[in-house]
Amino acid sequence: MKYSSFLLLFIYIFFILNNINAQSCPSTSSTWRPTMASFVTPTSPSIATIQPQLDFLLGKNNLVFMGQYGYSATSITDGPTGVANSFTMNYDTWGPAMHWLVVKTPVPALKANQNYEFSFGFKLGQVLGSYNKIASISVNFFNPADITDPNGGSQYFVTPAHPAVYSKTVTTGSWTSSTTFAQNIITLTPTVDIGLSIMAIQITRTSQTGPAITTMFVSNMKLSIPSRTVPAPPTNLITKDSELIAIPKPLSSLDAQDSTTCPYLATDLVHWHDPTIWTSGVVPLPSTSSNIIIPAGKKVLISPCSINQTGIYQKITIPATSELIFADASLTMNIQDIYVQGKFIMGTTKCRYNANINIVFNGAMTTVDTIAQYFGSKGIAVASGGFISVHGRQYHNTWTKLAATAWSGDNVIYIQDDVNWIVGQQVVVATSVYQDEKYPENEVMTIAAIQGKVIQFTEPLKYYHYGGQEYQAEVALLTRNIVFQSESSSAASSFGGHVLVSGEGQFAGIQLIRMGQRNIKGRYPLHFHMANTVSKSYISDCSVVSSYYRCYTIHATNNVTVTRNVAFDVNGHCYYLEDGVEMDNTLSFNFASYVHTIGTPAAGYNQYGQDFTQSSSLAQPADVAAGGFYITNAWNSFIGNAASGGWAGFSFPNLDAPIGNSINVPIVPKQFTTKVFQGNTAHSSGYFFEFGSSIYVGGDLSTGSDGLLVYNSGRISRETYLNGVESGGEIWMRFNNTKVYLSNRGIGMWGERVEVILLESHDSIRPGSLFGEAWLSDAIVNGQTGNLLSKTTDYSRQGFQFYDTYVKTILTNIIFRNFVHNPLSTSPEDDNRVIISMTHSDEFKPQFISATKNITIQGTAVSQYIGHRIFDTGSSRQFNFVDYDGTISGRSVPTIFGAHDKWWQFDNTCTYNNDWNSWVCNKGTYEVASVSVEVPGYMDRSGEYDATSNVGYIYLFGSGITDSRRMNVTRNVGITGISDFGWYLYWTVGTPSYIKLWLSEVPYGHYVFFAIPYPASTTFKVSCEYKYNSQHSYNFTQATSAAAVRSGDGKKYYFNGTHLFVKVINFVLNGSEYFSRGGAKINDVYWEFIVHITATNTVKPPVNGFYTGLTDVLPSSTL
């Protein structure tokens, strides 16, 4: 009896405690409402005139002990107990007299001629003696490329290749005490601005460490930027973010509001805290097991007093006829699952909420569907037919850009756009370094004061953020007043909450923190899932922060608008189009930053890249190449977005078929071109893979025979057609008004057709790598900007590298700027040249595949215009391009650039440029032609022979040429040279008895006049054929002279007893076979028009198919 009474009392107390909030609601009347939140912009303090000191702390966790020897993993250990920010240096016996403490993390940028302080406390572990006496301490700032990478795992300090950018050595200091920490301050005054650097402290003793282990203690080591007066505002604030292109921006006005439409004003609402609406007659309590079902046909209003704000509710189900409506009043709800079949309302399009509403998702990691079948656990799921509307206060713009460079130590920044941000909110200032993951310099800052476009932070910036005319670091608002987040303990499992919508959904003004469930498909922070074509769905001005898995996902859903959102610190692809069937969606004015791959980033040592297969630790294998925007189907609109960091900023993988839930949809996703790609920006990406880029059209994603996804990160061709079907006809993939900077290859396109119109590229290794029929026009390609962090020898700059075979590349209306000679370069390819040849291969050789027109080169020495590496390969010997107006050559007439061999010196207009390693000639009426000379079993297209497999030479002859103008020929087929000239082909092993000439590129109206040596008394059968029909098959007849052959119709040959003369013309052509853009033209490589030459000689028959012993004699110069 006593036990029963006690139990009843306990239940009563538990009920009272858990309903204390409900009991505080004054009324259950349908007319009662809590006081709704209102918003008055808080008054900001004035901008303070003093910026505080910035201390960059150095300790055990961000230092590496290095030396030539005498180091180990325990060379640095914890400091003495009770001494804050301290560490111990442990010296082994007979170690070297010198060692280094190298900083693992980026250090602040330092201005020339300003004073900085390096300080530390120091104490000897043993009494001062001959083996622990310090002679000097030196503080050094090195270019990262010059010393051992402190994050690379090695403690061996490589002797720097070059002197430190700045160094300060002191030989006196408080280094002798073994009883107390003595303070040391070293003043640093750099003589040059220091951008990206590695700080290394060299400690030198008077001798080796001796026979006994010694220790030294260091406390509170730091690099300090002293407090100073806030500088006067710059007079040259950026007002236009680009010089050439136009990056669109959202409307400046706030979304229209009408408070009379707010959902909490409806007269037919009932209160959550009204026990009479519940079938049990009791207001539901937080519980670890109960499913709270909203009464059918009811619109239930939640007020702060309605619920317990500390207990965890297990699950809420909203039936199809019901609605759950939140009041615009601040509250916190802890929940595991919410299942929406009806409506979930927390503000609307016309009634954004002002309250601070915090929804905290709780729950341990599981793959059990606790929300509903297929909808997972720990989050909100909206069923097909359901509706969700969540609208927080609008902060606009959600992101902007710097209007001036911000230095390390600054606590005031200037931005370009009007914003209505407020004191106390957090922003992220994006990085201005190339390798975002290696040197993490994104900074989350808190607003202390804001006056118009001037923002002051509570603390100084640690790093340098560039805001020059070329480009400017983004500044994005992270804070929102409605927050969906997971409990902080979820970080250990990366199992956060998720929001999944299979019906219609409208989201605006939400911050999502620690959301997503790592490697569980379909469990993303904000996710439209298999909703088909929607009519009123959008995600606007939200933020995703510290996501475990993605940001904003569109999965098998069309017609969604995703606009003005931001994301920061994200694992896996961020803005994510999942299966390849997603079309007609609009992603506009969004920002993604600091996006991390899952697992080791995809790399590889050649164009193939690497292969990855789906696994429990990599549910989507393409996440090894995670980027800001992942686009499995290009037929969507991308307008005014920006991506900072990631493997790529924008990634277009190739899908031969949809994947996942959409695997049976009968389309080929990779055949769709971009619907709209306008005004997008990407930077600080593309560097994990040699062939990576910030906008990457490449890689392949498919479903294997075992049902697992397979991803290849490398070169995959992409054909694009109108409406995504081959019968629709070929169409070019187009990128308009694009900016790339601090990038590897800017825009990387492995496909067959691409147009890049209006491009700015700054501080990138290359502006792009464009394959197929490619046109780059109206661009600025800037090798070096004013960004201090980009002034490094870590990577070279190339204006554009022409490919080596079977493409067509046209560059028009381009300004190349600031390609400055690198005195440390070892070849033209790393010497910051404007036009670069590709010379590594003998198997792949260029035809006429590259052309330019209207090129302007600024801030660049003429010697830097062309970078051609002389290499013993066909691709080096046959490098060529046409400068259609002579703006590169400076001749003001169409010009042919040819490689280093005299083979390219075809007339008296040709001059050799030693800086360029190239011949430069007036084009005149000539074209560049290419012929594949094949000898079955010896020289054929299927062979892959060594570059040194020389078989002879090709010479120019006739036209008054008397000297030797030749080029090596190897067993790898393909000879490119000048049309309408004599080509004399000599084999050192003897002339083959059968030769097949594929006229791969002999343009319409032009020819090649061949001369080939044979022994006397040889007879010939010469014919031509087109593989695909017999209309142009001819048997050649013998002419009366070589001159008659050259002036003839291309169906004759002549043998003068030493040389066979054959004029080859492609009879299939009609003059339409070319790719033309911007006033430049490249002729097609035309497949399989063949000339056959069969030689017979009974007097001196061939030996193993070759006529040997022939003299190498140039034909007459008068021909």
UniProtKB/Swiss-Prot annotation:
All residue ranges annotated as the G8 domain in the record: 276-404
Pfam families: CEMIP_beta-hel, G8
Glycosylation sites noted in the Swiss-Prot or TrEMBL record: N308, N559, N736, N854, N968, N1035, N1056, N1070
Alphabetical list of PROSITE patterns matching this protein: G8
Keyword entries, A-Z: Glycoprotein, Secreted, Signal
Cellular component aspect of the GO annotation: extracellular region
Subcellular location: Secreted
Record has Secreted as a keyword: yes
InterPro entries (alphabetical): CEMIP_beta-hel_dom (IPR055401), G8_domain (IPR019316), G8_domain-comF-like (IPR052334)
Transport is among the record's keywords: no
Superkingdom of the organism of origin: Eukaryota
Signal peptide limits: 1-22
Similarity annotation: Belongs to the comF family.
Descriptive protein name: G8 domain-containing protein DDB_G0288475
